[in-house]
A protein has these predicted regions:
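PP2C/PPM-type serine/threonine phosphatase catalytic domain
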Residues: 1-156
Length: 156
């Protein structure tokens, strides 16, 4: 339900207040739905001048520059309550746009491997290759994963 809600309304997003409003309305709608559960949600609005992130839950958004330290853009988000609880507390922040790679990922990646391995994997290879390599970092020898792994890599 969260994805459908986002798809129906994403074109009107212009600033961090719009992003917060979307997540609040999504939370209220999912809370009223008898079938919908709770979910984490992380989104990034990238313009020519800035990156706006809005999130709730344990997914994260990182900026990985070509060199130097990575930046956790969702460091101030609330882990719980999640979207669909009716009590979610979304956080939205604005950052100047940097050169590098933007990573949006679930905790299935962020929790089960080190930041150093993630950053090293993202640097020096095309985004599609890096994305496949990132999923391999957390795969068990059996081929299973410890948790769901969803990620988006966006070169900036």
């Amino acid at each position: 339900m969260a994805v459908e809600f986002f798809r129906a309304d994403h074109e009107r997003l212009q600033n961090h207040e719009d992003c917060l409003d979307l997540l609040r309305r999504m939370d209220a709608a999912m809370d009223q739905d008898q079938v919908a559960g709770e979910t984490t949600f992380a989104m990034a609005l990238v313009t020519t001048e800035e990156i706006i992130v809005a999130s709730v839950g344990d997914s994260g958004i990182w900026l990985i520059p070509a060199t130097g330290n990575w930046i956790n853009l969702t460091v101030h988000q609330q882990r719980k309550p999640m979207i669909g609880s009716g009590d979610a507390k979304p956080a939205a922040l604005r950052y100047p746009r940097f050169e590098g790679t933007l990573l949006l990922a679930t905790d299935g990646l962020l929790k089960y491997t080190s930041a150093d391995r993630i950053v090293e994997t993202c640097r020096g290879q095309p985004a599609n290759t890096a994305a496949q390599s990132l999923t391999e970092l957390v795969k068990y020898p059996s081929g299973n994963y410890p948790d769901d792994v969803t990620l988006i890599l966006m070169p900036l």
